[in-house]
UniProtKB/Swiss-Prot annotation:
Keywords: DNA-binding, Fertilization, Nucleus, Transcription, Transcription regulation. Belongs to the MATALPHA1 family. It comes from the Eukaryota. It is found in: Nucleus. Residues 60-117 bind DNA. The lineage of its organism: Eukaryota, Fungi, Dikarya, Ascomycota, Pezizomycotina. The keyword Metal-binding does not apply. GO terms for biological process: positive regulation of mating-type specific transcription, DNA-templated; single fertilization. Its main location: nucleus. This is Mating-type protein MAT-1.
Amino acid sequence: MDLARDPTGAEIAKFIATRTGAQMVQLMRCIKEPAAQAAFTAKLLVASPAVSGQPATPEKARKALNAFVGFRCYYITIPMFKPWPMKKLSNLIGLLWEADPNKSLWSLMAKAWSTIRDQIGKDQAPLNQFFRIICPHLKLPDPASYLEIHGWILNVNEEGDPTISRSADSEFASIGTGNTDMTLSVEDIITYVQSLGYAHGFILDDNKPSSTFLGHSVSSTLEKNTSAISATQATSKAAHARFLVRNKRRAKRQAVRNASYRASLDQDILIAHQLDPAPVDNHVPDCYSTTAPVLNQSPNQFYDGLTTLLSDQIPTIQDDAGHLDNAHLFNDCSLPGDVSFMNIDDFTTNMPNLIDYDAFRLGADEDVTLPIFDDITQI
């Protein structure tokens, strides 16, 4: 039979560390003496946290920053790019990256920032602040002067989109940019930015050898730059050719639409007038001929004489002024229509010969014998 023994301090500590909250409250209630409760509470305050028996899941490694992404984040702030959104500048940034002679520097800077971020977090290592510190140190062009230093010209096409092209004398514009005569490592970049107050929480492992370093040479930079320029110029020419082909297609479609509009308009005019379209080269008359018959306007002696006689016999106010007040005029409207002029008392006229005009009265006998006009020659 095993003898009872007192537990060791390690066993007590392990027992306490593996208790739940409810069990700890129960233990506190079992201690009656105040001194013992105070000692137990002090022990709990300095006790190490409980360690789970299951192994902790390792944190997934973060993806390192891409060199092009870093280049884009820095040079997207070029002042001349400000009027356009990012989607219109992506192609331009790609062209700048293809011709940039400092891709190796950007890869090294991206590696250095990724190392800092993985240890202290992204919030404690702002990317834009990192580039503002290290890029001037490495003699990289700032965004305001990048296009001019590398010989780029910014233009705007007919659709209002930005385009870039390179001047003919820009082949040697990139020589001398960047630190071409220095050996650089990731640790060198981290040490420099920390010396200026960036990423204080990062702890550099001095015992770990650098896995990434850079040694520049002017000749290699020039060769890369020349090939990049050739590729960029070829890309620009291809884009311009595509632009011209697209404009030709649009012009052709517009010409077809205009022709259809003209044909439709001509058809509408033809239907409206029911006439054949006049030739373009012939003179168009001011008015169109009609099919209405034209009256015979040749003079007729009988009708001309009759019109003259009737118009001359109508008295005027001036001619009738000398007649008596109680006399009736020939053209008096107050006279009844069924009374013969010959039966009217005090009838007066200014005609030299009294002629019976009852045959011309409305409703007269159509078979009445017409008067003889002595002054009209017989036809």
